[in-house]
């Protein structure tokens, strides 16, 4: 039903499907919202390795230790997002643990842009930022290796001096269903319903009721995009 919602929402907006397609998208996402899933109280708990079969997850790609050890392939591609493996000793000597500055199996090839990190940190109340990325301006920075920004949401586990990329990867979460519901209702002109569903997600993130209040269709769509990003 999540995929069905996305398809009919896309059909309505891009292929001229109109309200008929929106109606199908609406009934599809409503079925998801009534299926017994529940948002976890804390965003970080969604990605906890000890809590991967939780009530918020609709569909995930599961990984376990040693499931795939081929360099450069899933799930090992997460190593590209972490600190260079060659810096592990230097980081430890500087007093940083594997949890604070996780290192991968080779160089850090993927670095989130400063603009994206700034976007995620626009509101200091957003509890998702530190769970998703880390930005460093610490003493371990050198001219040779600049570890400034890294994605840490799927860093896996660390044991016996080895990092295993065993974090499950969510394809669909309940929070996304609420955002799809908000997008569908906004497209149908149901402003109150759109804001209600949008603010369910925002409430957990910012700890504020009715975080979004702007009622124009464009403003709501832009808010939905911000929450997705």
Task: Indicate where each model-derived feature is located.
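Acidic-aromatic pocket-rim loops
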Residues: 66-96
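Acidic, low-complexity intrinsically disordered regions
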Residues: 6, 88, 105, 112-115, ...
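A short, charged
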Residues: 90-133
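Acidic/polar-rich alpha-helix caps and helix-coil junctions
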Residues: 1-75, 121-229
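Short linear sequence elements within intrinsically disordered, low-complexity coil regions
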Residues: 52, 82-86, 101, 114, ...
């Amino acid at each position: 039903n999540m995929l069905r919602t996305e398809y009919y929402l896309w059909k309505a907006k891009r292929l001229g499907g109109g309200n008929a397609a929106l109606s199908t998208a609406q009934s599809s996402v409503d079925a998801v919202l009534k299926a017994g899933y529940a948002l976890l109280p804390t965003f970080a708990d969604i990605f906890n390795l000890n809590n991967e079969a939780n009530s918020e997850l609709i569909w995930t790609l599961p990984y376990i230790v040693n499931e795939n050890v081929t360099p450069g392939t899933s799930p090992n591609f997460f190593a590209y997002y972490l600190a260079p493996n060659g810096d592990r000793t230097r980081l430890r000597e500087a007093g940083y643990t594997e949890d604070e500055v996780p290192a991968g199996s080779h160089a850090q090839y993927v670095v989130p842009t400063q603009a994206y990190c700034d976007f995620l940190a626009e509101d200091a109340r957003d509890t998702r930022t530190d769970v998703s990325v880390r930005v460093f301006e610490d003493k371990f920075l050198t001219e040779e290796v600049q570890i400034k920004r890294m994605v840490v949401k799927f860093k896996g586990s660390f044991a016996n001096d080895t990092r295993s990329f065993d974090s499950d990867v969510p394809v669909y979460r309940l929070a996304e269903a609420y955002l799809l519901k908000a997008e569908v209702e906004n497209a149908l002109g149901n402003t109150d319903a759109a804001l209600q569903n949008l603010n369910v997600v925002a409430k957990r993130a910012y700890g504020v009721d009715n975080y979004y209040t702007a009622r124009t269709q464009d403003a709501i769509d832009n808010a939905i995009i911000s929450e997705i990003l």
